């Protein structure tokens, strides 16, 4: 857990070494922070406390580019800490974390997100209101997996020749 001041500097790092089955579902994790306004992140699979301390500013963390010759499932994952899970997800998707004012003990939420292999489809078509379209994707084959990725999402490709109208495919590099 990285707790930056309101300017995105002076991090307080709380490192938890999580092993075994607990890796995929961590709840009730405590972290150190001073009262005041902060931007808080969860960084999974960072490796060590020393590695986490290398992110001396929020900008250094968010601009991190990581290379991996093939995805192993152990790459770093980033989560934005917020008052609830929905806000955490929305902040991550926007790529902009908000300042949290810590006045005492409190509960927060963060969803950590894998940095690649997220595929999003958006299919639009004008239909009468009483019609429905069902899309069942049973298999997705990805021919070129990324070797370099960032911790934040961005829209990579837009394809205009979709099955029914516009299709947008969003991948993490």
Q: PLM ranges: what are they?
A:
Residues 1-58, 122, 127-173:
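Tryptophan-paired
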Residues 28-31, 78, 97-98, 109, ...:
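Beta-strand-rich interaction surfaces with strong enrichment in secreted/lumenal proteins
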Residues 17-23, 49-107:
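Structured interaction patches on ligand/partner-binding surfaces of diverse proteins
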Residues 29-34, 103-113:
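Exposed beta-sheet edge/beta-hairpin loop segments within beta-rich domains
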Residues 111-126:
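A short, Gly/Thr-enriched small/hydrophobic beta-strand-prone motif that recurs across taxa
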